Each structure stands twice: as C-alpha cells, then as structure tokens.
Amino acid sequence: MEAKVEKIETNVVKLEIKVEAEKFDAALTKAYNKNKGKYNVPGFRKGKVPMAILKKMYGIEIFYDDAVNIAIDESYNEALKAEDIRPVDYPKVDIVEIGEGKELVYTATVTTYPEVEIGEYKGLDIKKPSYEVSEEEVEKQVKEMQSKNARVETKEEGTIADGNIAIIDFKGFVDGEAFEGGEGTDYPLEIGSGTFIDNFEEQLVGLAIGDKKEVNVTFPENYGKEELNAKPAMFEVTVKGIKVKELPELDDEFAKEVSEFDTLAELKENVKKRLEESNNERAEREFEEAVITSIIETSKIDLPEVMLTKEIDSMMKDLESRLQYQGLSLDQYMEFTGNTIEKMREFMKENAERKVKADIILEAVAKAEEVKATDEQLNERALELGRMYGPKDPKKMANILLKAQKAMIEKDIIIENTLKLIKESCK
C-alpha cells in the first residue's frame, strides 16, 4: 500500500492510495468466493462454478464492487495510521484505476479532526462563587412542605380568596377564535400559584360559585407557541367550586409525619443542608462554565461542520429518548411547543458548538499535560454505569461496558480530570 496526502482546505485532505496488484487480485478472489453461490451455470453445481468460467461469461467486472470494498477496508485504515490522520466522517471515495492484474488506485477525501491552538488555561483568574443559605430560604422550603401536606376542604359559601383552589371551566379566544389547548373543564387552579398566565388568577378573586367572567390577559412574548406569543386573549371562565387548604401546624408532630426526623428543628437543619448542597452544585457548575468559556475564548480552532452536525444529531436523539420516556413523540412535542425540527436544531447549535469545542480543547490540554484515567477511576465509573444499565447484576454489566466502551469511558474521565486540573490552578 502506498499513500499520498494532499491538503484540500482547512480540516480536509485527499489521500491517493495505491493497492498492490497482488492484493487487489486477492480481493477479487474474496469477492468471487462471496458471490459464487449466486450463479447457476449448466454442468456445475451451485457455488462450484470456477472463477475463470464466471469471468468468461459475465466479465471480471461483476466482482469489482465487492473487491473494491474489501481492498478499501484493508488499505484505508492502514493509510490513515501511516499518515497520522484522524478522520471525523466517512470518506468520499473515487476510483482512479482498476483492473485484474493491476494496481487499484483510488482517492479518499475526508474531513479530519481539527488542529487547535490552546489558549491560556493555567492560573486563570476565575473564582468559584459562593452562595449562602438564608433563613428565609429554609422557611420557604418548609412552608412548601406544609402546603403539600395540607388538607383540602370544600368552601360552601363565600368567594375566591388568595390561596384558595378555584374549580373552573375555561375557554380561551385569540382574535375572536378559540385556540387549541385553551380549554379546560373542572380545572383546579390554586390562586397565587402563578400556574396560569400573568394576571389571570388575580381576576378570579372575589368570584363566587356559579359566577361567570371574561378574563383578559396577554400571552408572554416567549410563551412557546408562535401563534400565541405576545397575543392578547380572552378567557370565558365559570366558577364551579371553591376549595380551601387547611395547613397543618408547623411543629414536631409535623416533622415526624413528613420526614424521618423527630423535631421541627432537625427537619429545618436537614432542609438547610440540602439547600447548601444544591448551592454548592450550582456554584461548581457556574465555576466550570466560566472556566470553559475562558479557554474557548482564548483558544483558536476551526470546527468542521460535520462535527457540529453530529453533535446536534446526538442532542436530538437524547431529546427524543427523554420524550419517549415521558410518553411523547418528537412530533407531538413539536406540535405542543409550536416548534419545528429545523428551529430546534438551530436552537441547539450554540450549545453543540460550545460542547464540541470544549471537548477538543480539553483533549489537547490533556495530551499536553499527560492527563490519564486510573484503573480505579475506570472500574468505578464502569460500576456506576453498571448500576444504571444492569441493576440486577451491576458487576457483570460493568465488565461488559469496559470491554465494549472502554475508550469512550476513558475519554470522559480524562476530560473530567483535565477540567479538574485547570480549576485547581485557578487563582
């Protein structure tokens, strides 16, 4: 095998690859053995027709397609390795010369993994933010628990007040026409919850059972359905019932009923601890995002379009999987949100570009700093994945994953270790 490389443009090369005549003839023989059972020739059992007879009857060209595929499979990867080329997509192959007893000459034009000029990543002037938990936040969480555990009783007389649950029928109109999804029957709406459009719930305060009212509101600009964004709407509302929440006392008995704690003080302490953990996770995410933003901004990289397209494809598949788990199809989701596949892909583009660039840059930093994944980290991560995908026998699943996806698992850990290295060096 002989290969020549020509740079066509940024991140695109053309390889001219020559396969020796003997190797191409061997590929023709393999193609014959693969296909000889397809031909019926009088005087020969099926699959026993000699290659010379088939060549005479049909021409050697009948084996070219399979022989070319066999020869390319054997020579293309060898050429990539010899020339230290890392492709990111399938090649476009053109045959230059072909024939029995001759060299096979073909070109393979392929998009390559981009080169990166790493920017500043050591000693970045970025600090991890810190978020304190206030007593007000703790009280708010406890009150939410109190609200969720409230008894609901029917209000026989009187009018709707803030905090009540109004049982309503409603039908919405935009430009005088009813719109899809704007109708409900016996809907329990908690006044003050902010469930409906701004200023909807407030207009129900003071109404009694049996009252009807036209509620006028305006949809927000980013409502999610293009035909409703920023549109004024009128809802015909009928009050069918009113319910009142009876809140339990916030005391030690409440703590025992809603948690594993014996006292309200212990419950509040646990709530505070969980809020602190949540704040720490938020701070870590923001710190990490700031670091990634910095290294992307100071690094130079020409991102091949195909890598961006593949990442968006992956994000779309993830979205579809999450929707299926919730019992929705992608088409249903698009209909509900007023989106299209094209708009969703465009929406994902910025995040996809950021992720691909970050991975490429961090991989380059990892190479420069000789960052590795330890055996302990590999085994631990495989076991985590094993618990997720094979809960009945996590260890067995972990072993399967280590054999099938070790390179991918190792890459993820190296990226994480590299990011940790950069964060630890921040001032």
Swiss-Prot record:
GO biological process: 'de novo' cotranslational protein folding; cell division; chaperone-mediated protein folding; protein transport; protein unfolding
Enzyme class name: isomerase
Protein localization: Cytoplasm
Chemical reaction(s) catalysed: [protein]-peptidylproline (omega=180) = [protein]-peptidylproline (omega=0)
A Pfam family the protein falls into: Trigger_C
GO molecular function, one term: peptidyl-prolyl cis-trans isomerase activity
Keywords: Cell cycle, Cell division, Chaperone, Cytoplasm, Isomerase, Rotamase
Alphabetical list of NCBIfam families matching this protein: tig
Membership in a protein family: Belongs to the FKBP-type PPIase family. Tig subfamily.
Name this protein carries in UniProt: Trigger factor
Organism: Clostridium botulinum (strain Alaska E43 / Type E3)
